[in-house]
Amino acid sequence: MQIRNLVAALVLSFGAFGACAAPTAVVEGVQMPAWVERGGLKRPLAAGMELEAADRISTGANSRVLLRLAEGSQVKLGENAQMSLDRLAQRQDGRQTFLQAALDVSRGAFRFTTDVKAKLLSRREVDIRVTTVTAGIRGTDLWGKSADDRDIVCLIEGRIAVQREAEQPVNLDQALQFYIAPKAGGRPDASRPVQLATVTPEQLTQWAAETEIAAGQGAARRGGKWKLVAAASPDQNAALAVYDRLRAEGYAASIFPVGSAEKRAYEVRIGSLPSKAEAEALAIRVEPITGSRGRAGT
């Protein structure tokens, strides 16, 4: 593998598709593997990455993603999920941030949360589509999931309007109400009506866990100071091979030349980890890919 391939790897390591001064959406945390696709290019999702309209996010097994929108709302994704940022725009209205967004969750579980401060200091107009169902959000906390046989939207707090294709919208204004839209072959099943019910606290706890980043899983966080050195080698080709494998599997690896010219080596790193414990947990997760146990560092 030639030097220009190492240069290309370094560009990917430091670049993030390009950045804007005030990101409308940013990756706060990611429990890899996860990817983002933009303009036909698919690459690993990294903590701190700024997102744009038309980006498509996907997660793998045992993966989680936490996004923060410009006005303070959070979007969480569970494992084996797919979400497109169909519309994403912001503007300042006096001292308030006004966010307009359309999110399309075509697979997996998600959660949308607006905290008290964000409600007071901003406004939002967000539509979330869950395959066959659209929920209109103005400031709330909800959980949803697109499964093979049904789409679910659960109101945790606030108020939302939920609508299945070509049907009248249904207003949910009671905490813990949820809406189920049966599907058949990935399409609305008109032979079965939508259902409304109230979720139990126990079930809600189970649902919420599907989108939460848990401690000890090796998740990266924006601003994390720790790193995992997943591999190190004096052989540039060997290091690049590990780098390529990690990125193909959805891990945001970077490659760095270290040492003097006489004793040059190449480290493959995954950064933005919040603690030594998370770096060590990630080392265990990626060992089957790298073939060796990495080491934590700062």
Residue ranges and their predicted role:
Residues 99, 151, 226, 264-268:
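Short beta-strand micro-motifs in enzyme catalytic cores
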Residues 22-159, 163-177, 182-221:
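Flexible, surface-exposed loop/linker segments and immediately adjacent secondary-structure boundaries
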Residues 66, 143, 227-229, 267-269:
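Short aromatic/hydrophobic contact patches that present stacked aromatics
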Residues 1-7:
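Bacterial N-terminal signal peptides that target proteins for export
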Residues 223, 234-298:
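Extracytoplasmic
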Residues 220-230:
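Short glycine-/aliphatic-rich beta-strand segments at the starts of folded cytosolic domains
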Residues 9, 19-20:
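Cleavable N-terminal signal peptides
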